Amino acid sequence: MSLGYLKGQPKALNTFLAEHKEENALRLWYDAPAKDWQSQALPIGNGYMGAMFFGGINKEQIQFSEGTLWSGGPGSNEDYNFGVRKDAWKHLAPVRKLLDEGKFEEAHALAKKELTGVLHKSENDLSTFGDYGAQQTTGDIFITVNHSEKVSNYKRSLDIEKAEGYVTYNIGDNHYKRTYFGNYPSKLMAYKFESDQAENYTIAFSSPHKKTKESFKKGLYSYQGEVIDNGMQFETCLKIASDGKVSFDEGKIKVKNAKYFVAYHVATTDYINQYPTYTGNDFIGENKQLIHQLKGKSFEDLQKEHRLDYQNLFERVDFHLGYKEGEDLPTDRRLMAYSKGKNDFWLEQLYFQFSRYLMISSSRPGTMPMHLQGKWNNSTNPAWACDYHMNINQQMLYWPAEVANLSECEEPLNDYIESLVEPGKVTAKEFFNARGWTVSTMNNPFGYTSSGWGFPWGFFPAGAGWISQHLWEHYEFTQDDQFLKNQAYPIMKEAALFWVDYLQEDEKGNLVSYPSYSPEHGGISKGASMDHQIAWDLFNNCIAACEVLEIDADFKKEITTIRDKIAPPTIGSWGQLQEWMEDVDDPDNKHRHVSHLYALHPGKQISLEKTPEWAEATRVSLNARGDGGTGWSLAWKVNFWSRLKDGDRAYQLYRRLLQPIGFEDESIHSSGTYANLFCGHPPFQLDGNMGGAAGMAEMLIQSQTGTLEILPALPKAWKSGSVKGLKARGGYVIDISWKNGKLKTLSITSVKNGPCTLLYKGKQQVKEMVAGETVEVKF
C-alpha cells in the first residue's frame, strides 16, 4: 500500500490512517441477530461472570452464568466424600499382580470396581453428574421493545480492542444503539440501550433455579435463589438508570418514555473455595457493596474504567499478518470464504487476539479459573459438567497465558491448583497409599480429586503432575522468585512425592507407572508412556526449582536418581513413538488423544536438537494419527508440528481448526469453528481456541530448550508480518518483524540481568541483558 500521494498533506494522511485503522479494527460483526447460543451469540465477561448477547431486535436475550454457581458438592447429600473410595489402595497390589501376569481383562475389571471414584445420585440432581455436580447457568435477562416497522442497517458486533459488544440499527430516521461490557474492577456487567426517540422497554429475568426472594426498590431489582440439589445461595441484581420512568409490575421492570436506560448487573453466590465446606460468603452483603460503589459514577465512568483495565492487558501484544482485503464481510461469511481456500490473514490474527480477549474476559485474579467453556454456560446439565478436565483440556486452556503476555490471567489457575492440594492428599493416600497429592481427569470446585467413576476416562493419576507444569511455566516466564518459593515449588514438590511412591521397578530395572491408562485410549496397562513423560517432566522442573532457590539438596539428589530410572520413550516396530511399553500401536488408529507425545509438547523431554531419533518417531506417530480430530485435538497438533519446526504442516492444521461448523446453511466439518469463532469440539469448548492461539505463538517463538529461537516454524503463507509483546521463558518480551519470510527486526526486553541465547535459522548469538533495557538484535 503506497501513501505517497498523501505526502505533504498531514491532515489528509492522519485522516486516512484513522479510517484505515477503523476499517481494520479487531471486531467480529454480523448483519443479523443470533438464533443459537453456542454458535452465534457473542460473549462478554468480567472474569467473575460470562454473558452472551443475541442482539434480537424486538427482544434481546442476555444469558449469563456466575463462575461459582454449581450443583453438587458437600451440600448435595450427607454422604458426599469428594469421590473418595476409602482404603481403595488395598486393591492396588492385586491389580498390579494381575498386570504382571498379563491378565489385563481381570486387572481392568478389578480396577474398574475398586480404583474408581464414588458418585451418588438422587432424584433432586440438576445434572446427570450426581453429587459431583455441574456448572450452572444463572439465568437470562430478556429486554423487550416493540418495533412494528421495518429495521434497516442492522449490525451486531464485538469489538475485542475495547471488549465491548454493540447492536445498532435504524427504523426510519430513528437510530438505535446498544452497548454491552463486563467491568472487572467493579465486578459488574453493564448494558446500555439508546435511541434518538423515546421508547418503552420491559425487562424480565428468568432462572431455572428456585426463587427464594424477589424485590424492587428505587430502581434496584434483586433476585435471590437457590440451587435445589445442594442449597447453594445466590443473588443477582439489576440497577436501572434512565431518563424515563422506571417501575416494577408483575415481576417485570418497566422503563417508559426513555431515550436511554442502563442496567448495571451484579451476581454473587455463597461459595468460598475453602476445603471442606466451600460455603460462607456473604453474597448479599457483597452485592450491596457492589451496588453502593456505583454512587456518583456514570456509565461513561465505568466504561472508561473498564477500557483502561482491559486494554492494559490486551494492548501488550500487537499481531499483524495483513489488512482486510476486498469486501468487509460479516465474520461468518469471512469464515466461509476462508474455508473455501481464500487467504485471510486478517481473520487469522483476529482469531489469535479473540483467544486473548476470551482469556482476559474469563480469568482474572480472584476469580475461578476457566472451565471447559471459559465462563460461558447456558445449561444446568452442560457437557462434561463444564468442569476442570485435567487430561488435556484444563492445561490447554492456559497454554497461551504466558507466551501471549497475560501472566496475571494464569493466577486463577495457580490458586485453584493450590486449593486441590489438601483434598488431593486424601486421594493420594486412600487410592494409592502414597505421599503427596494427586488428581485425575475430572475436578470440580468442591475438592473432587478422586478418579472418575468411569475407569477408561476417569483414571488418570498423572493429572496433578501435568497441571503442576503450569506453576513452573509461570515462574519461567515471569522469573518471580517469590512465587516459586512460596506457592509453586511447595505444590510441585508434593506432586513429585506422589510419583516417588507410585513408580515401581520392573524386571528391567526401569521405573514404571502402573496401573496406568493412556487418556481415554486403549486399556489398562503397565507403563503408559504419558505417565512416564509427565513424571520425568515434573521431576525435571523440581530439580530446576531446587537449583534456583538453592534448597532441598537431598530431595533434588533423590528425584534426579528416580528421574533417570524412569522408563524412557521407546520407538516401535514401524518407527512410531510407542504409546505403551508394549509395541501394540495401530498405524491406522486416528484417536483424538495423542497423549504419548506429551514429551514433545507441552513437555521438554523430546526435541529435534537433543533427541532427534525420538523426535522423528513423534513425526511418524503424528502422520499416522492424521490431521482430523476434535477441535482441541486439532489445536494440539498445531503445537506438535510447530515443535517439529514444520510451519507449513502446523499452518495446515491451523486452517483446518478454522473450518466452519454448525452453520445453518451448511456444516462442512464435524469439528472446527462456529460463526462466533468459538471452537467446536463439538460442542463448544474453549480449549481449542486457546490451543490454536498457543500454536500460532509456537510458530513465531520457542524457548522450551533454554534457547530463544526466532521464527522456528514460520509458515510460507505468512510471508510478511510482525508481532510485538510475546513473552519467552527467561523473562523476555519479544518484538519481531519479518519480510519475504526473512527476519527483518528483532528487539528483546528482559526482566533481569544475564545472558540470553538466541537462535535464528541455525545461527546463534548470546546477548548480555540488563533488566528493563531493550536490545536490538541483528542476524
Question: Which residue ranges define each predicted feature?
Answer:
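Catalytic cores of secreted or luminal carbohydrate-active enzymes
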Residues: E123, S127-N146, L686-R729, V733-I734
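A glycine-rich phosphate-binding loop feature that marks nucleotide/adenosyl-phosphate handling sites
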Residues: S516, I559-D564, L711-W718
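C-terminal catalytic domain of Rieske-type non-heme iron oxygenases
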Residues: G374, N378-S379, L511-S513, N623-G692, ...
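Well-ordered alpha-helical segments within folded domains of soluble proteins
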Residues: N391-E402, P461-W472, M530-N541, S595-K604, ...
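Acidic/histidine-rich catalytic neighborhood
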Residues: E494-A545
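Extended amphipathic alpha-helical segments enriched in small hydrophobics
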Residues: D481, K485-W499, W641-L657
